[in-house]
Amino acid sequence: MIERIYLAKPRGFCAGVVMAIQAVEKAAVREDKPVTVYHSIVHNHTVVERLSEGGRVHFVEDLDAVDALPDSGDTVIFSAHGISPAVRERARSLGLSTIDATCPLVTKVHTEAKKYAREGYTILLIGDSAGHQEVIGTRGEAPENTILVGVLGKTGPGLNDPHAVQVPDPERLVVLTQTTLSVDDTRKTVDILKARFPALVVPPSEDLCYATKNRQDAVKNIAPNVDAFLVLTSTHSSNGMRLLELAEAECGRAYRLETAADLTRLEQNGDLGGVRSVGITSAASTPDDLVQDVVAHFRALNPALEVIEEGEWENIEFREPKKIAPTQELPRTMQ
């Protein structure tokens, strides 16, 4: 029986996710017709389902599909993961007004990519998947200058091994990263590249976002106190899956949930056998009510359950993105 739960702080929604979700919610109320979101606004099924309720928000993976949507309006919202200039230009050519809900910390990486490309650098972009929306968007800012490098331990189509990647000019080289990677694995990957290419430029401010680091640190702090870890995340959430990997490495037993309903499977499989204390965290795109549902499940089994919250909440807010008409000049940071 679970006697004690340690809830990680921080966990769940980060400032970028809150900004993006609120942008969709406000646009759905403000616009005369339903709004369209390009890609999942954040990588969480529950969030997408809740926003879709009522028919005021549609989600597409291709902007050309907007016209085919019922009662489609002319406003499209870009997801928190960022988009390439090609997608932005396609929206403009289709006459769509846009609301860019890209996380400002992702936009910062885009800005760095454009800067270094203009200066003639080759960009080594560290990521965990060539198909991740954030990687696609960042690479799209400077496709001719960018080489994808798999973060340590990650392989796949389009990802180069940091031990073997080849570059055209080792003297004009900079490293940028996806924002949601393992802090430890990213540091090791950069160290490998720096050892191979001594002239490699590492930007002074880390690309990994504060929320990624803080959530990983919270897992490390709790792990010594628990028998097992539960991580609420979608498999599509990069930061959430990195939390799962970290929890398993630090604790030895870690399980992924999307909702409290998944606990039935764990209990039937005997996965929580012998577990008396459990740590719980959640991806930056996971609503906290899903975490509280898990706590309620265990409390129903043990009314004397002790719940301890470890760590501190963040106090960061991002400005609401503005709507841009298709004929309107883009802000300088988007050019």
Curated annotation (Swiss-Prot):
Q: What does this protein do?
A: Catalyzes the conversion of 1-hydroxy-2-methyl-2-(E)-butenyl 4-diphosphate (HMBPP) into a mixture of isopentenyl diphosphate (IPP) and dimethylallyl diphosphate (DMAPP). Acts in the terminal step of the DOXP/MEP pathway for isoprenoid precursor biosynthesis.
Tell whether Metal-binding is among the UniProt keywords: yes
Binding locations of isopentenyl diphosphate: H43, H81, H132, S237, S238, N239, S285
Q: Listed GO molecular functions? A: 4 iron, 4 sulfur cluster binding; 4-hydroxy-3-methylbut-2-enyl diphosphate reductase activity; metal ion binding
Instruction: Please state which protein family the record places this protein in.
Output: Belongs to the IspH family.
Q: Which GO terms describe its cellular component?
A: cytosol
What is one Pfam family matched by this protein? Answer: LYTB
Claim: 4Fe-4S is one of the keywords in the record: yes
From the Swiss-Prot or TrEMBL record, give the protein name.
4-hydroxy-3-methylbut-2-enyl diphosphate reductase
- Positions annotated as active site in the UniProt record: E134 (proton donor)
Organism listed in the record: Deinococcus radiodurans (strain ATCC 13939 / DSM 20539 / JCM 16871 / CCUG 27074 / LMG 4051 / NBRC 15346 / NCIMB 9279 / VKM B-1422 / R1)
- Source taxon at top rank: Bacteria
Q: Where does (2E)-4-hydroxy-3-methylbut-2-enyl diphosphate bind?
A: H43, H81, H132, T179, S237, S238, N239, S285
Q: Which NCBIfam families match?
A: ispH_lytB (TIGR00216)
GO terms (BP aspect): dimethylallyl diphosphate biosynthetic process; isopentenyl diphosphate biosynthetic process, methylerythritol 4-phosphate pathway; terpenoid biosynthetic process
Q: What is its EC number?
A: 1.17.7.4
The reaction(s) annotated as catalysed by this protein in its Swiss-Prot or TrEMBL entry are: isopentenyl diphosphate + 2 oxidized [2Fe-2S]-[ferredoxin] + H2O = (2E)-4-hydroxy-3-methylbut-2-enyl diphosphate + 2 reduced [2Fe-2S]-[ferredoxin] + 2 H(+); dimethylallyl diphosphate + 2 oxidized [2Fe-2S]-[ferredoxin] + H2O = (2E)-4-hydroxy-3-methylbut-2-enyl diphosphate + 2 reduced [2Fe-2S]-[ferredoxin] + 2 H(+)
Q: Which UniProt keywords apply?
A: 4Fe-4S, Iron, Iron-sulfur, Isoprene biosynthesis, Metal-binding, Oxidoreductase
- Pathway listed for it? Isoprenoid biosynthesis; dimethylallyl diphosphate biosynthesis; dimethylallyl diphosphate from (2E)-4-hydroxy-3-methylbutenyl diphosphate: step 1/1; Isoprenoid biosynthesis; isopentenyl diphosphate biosynthesis via DXP pathway; isopentenyl diphosphate from 1-deoxy-D-xylulose 5-phosphate: step 6/6
- Residues reported to bind [4Fe-4S] cluster: C14, C103, C209
Q: Which cofactor does it need?
A: [4Fe-4S] cluster
Co-factor binding details? Binds 1 [4Fe-4S] cluster per subunit.
